[in-house]
Design a protein with these regions (language model features):
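C-terminal, loop-rich substrate-recognition/catalytic regions characterized by aromatic stacking residues
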Residues: 30, 41, 237-275, 279, ...
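N-terminal cap/lid segment of alpha/beta-hydrolase-fold proteins
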Residues: 37-77, 512-518
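Accessory cap/linker subdomain of secreted extracellular hydrolases
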Residues: 42, 104, 113, 177-179, ...
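Proline/glycine-enriched tight loop/beta-turn segments at coil->beta junctions
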Residues: 65-68, 75-84, 156, 317-318
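Cap/lid segment of the alpha/beta-hydrolase catalytic domain
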Residues: 78-151, 200-201, 205-207, 368-379, ...
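Alpha/beta-hydrolase fold nucleophile elbow
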Residues: 154-166
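Short glycine-enriched nucleophile-adjacent loop
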Residues: 169-180
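Short beta-strand/loop motif that positions the catalytic acidic residue
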Residues: 318, 324-326
Length: 654
């Protein structure tokens, strides 16, 4: 049944139930996994035995629209309870229509066992929530209204804590800045999509990196049915609660679009029309948002529209205890750490002391997938497990229940995993105490192209300038191969992958140290500076930090990009390049913690593309998103005492 037919049938179903006639279930369950069904049913049965459950509760907002919530609370009605609140654009409907069983109810079950009420709510315009969906949780007043409503529930302790990962976390920072009296603490996980501008980072919710577009939204918006509001059911006014519950058990409202090979679809030019090739509407990607803001692909990094929605930025003070969970191979570890440090530096002293961070060595939202051998991409990171449930419930017990459980005293301010040595470490700050900048300078005989070139890294600049040259062709970009990203489709795997296949290319410059005599721990920011030239009006430069093992395996650690038109910043007009001139280009800081063992090597890769993690610069100086033709760019990297292209690492001596 297609989506239009589904919604038409759903409307008939709701009308029929409202009339008092209960039809047979309309969805055909695919009971292909009896063991999973048994587990799900057992969890639901246990939950029903200890919880009062209210599903499809419609919560009114100030404009009259209603947001749908599921409420779980302990059965002992003689007490009041703090609330763990999860709000999401994703489908948390309690019934898995296709499986013919409840969804995994482990999260509310654990909350009840720990003495909490647990409320899940869909964002405006998603699933059973009314109104029009607008990306990044706007309007922010929906959060205020939901928190006020929770504080007034007769069994509520008027203390609410937030938790969630990715798009279930992105709204938390902006809401935490609003000072709602019921909101007591927050635990954002992989929350970069909620960080607009902070310090040197103008990523605007993971949309940009260094002024280049991160293409993950191209696939994510489509795969989750977020481009338009067309698929959102419009229920009859006054529809009964019974009808909503029955509809939830009969219809899967999740988007199920045809599977797309994003490695091909994202190549389409112009960028604004990528959905035309797959028969999907442009929607909020290229047309407009429901609130009338311009399509996202048409905006620049400092477009006023970014500051009119649900993104948090560093003009918004947060005075709320926070437990920040991050990962090294996430989409935006740099802005995430910058946001954490910003709150620590600007909150009141008492609240600043209540900011804690955990940084795991995994990909986006993969905290609990760590194992005895935690494989991230292709690399074994060792045993990176951490008891996140003990940490988060210990945190909530302290701040929501007022328990003197010592969680703050026994938890380090920053707990981070050092890859290579494969161990958890602790610090009072990020970067860690004792981290010192160590700079390596790029040099070559003018032929650093590919793994077989003559590029190297020195402790001091080479007096002589022998620039390395390569041709960047936007029709043949360097392909994304591992890294910190998500949501690009099955064709692209995040994490640490062997980069030697890319290092065969002539448009990839390779600079390496010799085998290290002593081990080096790099924990903290990584700053790259290049002196570049081009015959194009505008182009991009990329940088990638690599660890080379004695057998030659070259694992990517961190990567970055800079669109040269923004080399003077994002609040100024773009500036163009002129042939024959050399320009200094700095990159926003990268972040990592990695131990380079003796006999391993440090390596830097330089190029002008990393596609489709980042969109291609077509080199014309035009808007890029609305162009169908690119031109070749003949690019140069200079390195000398006059042009000290370099990489500066934060080195910690133990």
């Amino acid at each position: 049944m297609n989506r239009v037919a589904k919604l038409a049938s759903l409307a008939v179903l709701c009308h029929t139930i409202s009339a008092g006639i209960v039809p047979p279930a309309l969805a055909q369950a695919r009971q292909q996994d009896p063991a999973a069904i048994a587990r799900r049913n057992a969890t639901e049965t246990e939950l029903e035995s200890i919880a009062i459950i209210e599903r499809k509760v419609m919560v009114p907002m100030r404009d009259g629209k209603r947001m749908q919530a599921d409420i779980y609370r302990p059965k002992d009605e003689s007490k009041k309870y703090p609330i763990i609140f999860v709000r999401t654009p994703y489908n948390f409907n309690y019934w898995d229509v296709e499986l013919g069983a409840p969804r995994d109810m482990s999260a509310p079950l654990e909350a009840i066992k720990h003495g909490y009420a647990y409320i899940e709510m869909n964002e405006r315009g998603r699933y059973f929530s009314e109104g029009d969906y607008d990306i990044l949780g706007v309007p922010l007043t929906d959060s205020d209204d939901a928190l006020d409503w929770m504080g007034e529930l007769p069994w509520s302790l008027d203390k609410v804590g937030l938790i969630g990962c990715s798009s279930t976390a992105e709204w938390q920072l902006a809401v935490a800045s609003r000072g709602n009296k019921a909101l007591t603490t927050f635990i954002p996980e992989s929350f970069g999509a909620g960080v607009g501008r902070v310090g040197p980072y103008f990523e605007q919710g993971n949309w940009f990196r260094g002024g280049a577009v991160q293409m993950l939204f191209g696939s994510w918006l489509y795969d989750y049915g977020l481009l338009t509001d067309d698929g959102h059911p419009k229920f009859p006014p006054g529809i009964s609660h019974e009808a909503l519950v029955t509809a939830a058990k009969s219809y899967d409202l999740s988007a199920h679009p045809p599977t797309i090979d994003w490695s091909k679809a994202l190549q389409h030019l112009p960028e604004k029309d990528i959905y035309a090739t797959i028969g999907a509407p442009h929607g909020i990607f290229a047309d407009a948002t429901p609130s009338g803001k311009p399509g996202m692909i048409t905006r620049t990094p400092n477009d006023p529209s970014w500051y009119q929605g649900g993104l948090w930025n560093d003009s918004m003070r947060i005075d709320l205890p926070g437990l920040w969970l991050m990962t090294w191979y996430d989409v935006s570890i740099g802005p995430n750490l910058a946001a954490y440090n910003y709150v620590r530096s600007t909150a009141s002293p008492a609240i600043a002391a209540e900011q804690f961070a955990v940084i795991a060595p995994v990909a986006h939202c993969s905290y609990k997938r760590a194992a005895e051998h935690t494989i991230v991409g292709e690399r074994d990171m060792g045993d990176a497990r951490l008891d996140y449930d003990a940490l988060t419930y210990g945190w909530f017990d302290h701040f929501l229940k007022g328990e003197d459980n010592g969680i703050l005293a026994k938890t380090p301010k920053v707990r981070y995993y050092t890859m290579g040595s494969n161990k958890w470490q602790s610090s009072d700050t990020w970067p860690p105490e004792g981290a010192k900048p160590v700079t390596y300078y790029l040099t070559s005989g003018g032929h650093a192209n590919s793994l077989y070139g003559d590029g190297s890294l020195l402790a001091a600049p080479d007096p002589k300038d022998s620039p390395d040259k390569f041709v960047y062709d936007p029709m043949n970009p360097v392909p994304t191969h591992g890294g910190g990203f998500c949501c690009l489709g099955a064709e692209y795997k995040p994490g640490a992958l062997d980069q030697r296949s890319l290092e065969m290319r002539e448009d990839v410059l390779v600079y390496s140290t010799g085998p290290l005599k002593e081990g080096i721990e790099v924990s903290g920011p990584i700053d790259a500076t290049l002196y570049v030239a081009s015959d194009a009006k505008d182009t991009d430069f990329t940088v990638k930090l690599i660890e080379v093992l004695p057998d030659g395996t070259a694992y990517n650690i961190e990567e970055n990009i800079q669109r040269v038109r923004y080399r003077e910043g994002y609040t100024r007009p773009p500036v163009w390049m002129e042939k024959g001139k050399v320009y200094k280009v700095t990159f926003q800081p990268m972040q990592t913690s990695i131990y380079f063992a003796p006999a391993h090597q440090l390596r830097i890769e330089i190029s002008s593309s990393n596609f489709p993690q980042f969109d291609r610069n077509l080199n014309t100086g035009g808007d890029n998103y609305n162009e169908s033709q690119g031109i070749l760019a003949h690019n140069e990297v200079h390195h000398s005492a006059q042009y000290p292209s370099s990489i500066t690492l934060s080195v910690v001596k133990r």
